[in-house]
Amino acid sequence: GFDYIGNDGQQKSVPRLFNESVFNISVKEFFKIKEKLADYLHGGNEEDIFDYIPPQRTNQIFTPRRVVTMMVDLLEEQAPEIFKNKETTFIDLYAKSGLYLTEIAKRLFVGLKEAIPNEDERIRWILKRQLYGCAPSNIIYNMVKNYVYAGFPEVDDSNLLELDLTEAAKEGQVKQVLAERFGKEMKFDVIIGNPPYQLNVGNTSGNSSKAKAIYHLFVSEAMKLKPYYLCMITPSRWMTRSTEGIPESWIDEILNDNRIKVIHDFPNSNDCFPGVEIKGGVNYFLWEKHYEGKCAYYLHQDANKLVQSNVGYLNSSNSGIVIRDVNSLSIIEKIRKVESDYISKNSFSNLVSPKD
């Protein structure tokens, strides 16, 4: 970890990504099983390096394989053709394990069987022409590179950059920085991943009250790259306007952006990230460039049991928030019809915000 002075003159801290001693032991264990893990394209291997690394005290949340699979499943359900098209490009803007890239590679490897029959040519094409990623630190970069490319030493790994896009996201310069690093303006059809959630401001004590949300910046910058599909997992507190550091204007824009096609919402973050508390829960969503319509909203509770679902606009009844309790929607609509002034953005969000 390290401290630095931000553009606003305040001291800020970036915590360690890992507990050093635990991480070193884990890496040794990883190299013992490296050969076993190298072939992620064939067979049903469910392990990866993060099975050997305990949860870390950091704002870098590593995505479990099960969650990665659910997100890529959503992509495949909604747009199966992208995994059969050898021109489709994918990027993870904040790769922390390589799981998104390898899961996509697996789907492409199957989907392109007819287009590129030779397996060696197929994987070379996928890794060189279709998959891209940015890893935020040297240690993560080497780990992702080893996981994604180690089984294919003949494949060029230049599509994976050692690049932390946090500052670029804060400055609204992600597109420009990517163009500089790749040597040309890039076009990505699909952006997927788990962006950083917050940046600690102040001293190194890790005072959570000083934490400023930054995930919304990655969502905005991803949209500016104009992909056909955007799939990310983020905290859910924006839905009820109960998060610090996210402008009201950003929340308004997202609530009224009818290109968000699907949201899976988990009020208990442990259902996605075991042992990690994220107040208000987490959600993953699918945004589609050419979609304009209602959002299919799914609420998961009780260890991922699907309890509620609804198809409607995010800004239901112009409430200014996402009504996470689907059963309340009909009641709210009845109240709105009787007394339209009763529900205002400020008072209503205060009434139904989750208790943290």
Q: Model segments located where?
A:
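SAM-dependent methyltransferase catalytic region
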Residues: 1-262, 268-272, 281, 288-294
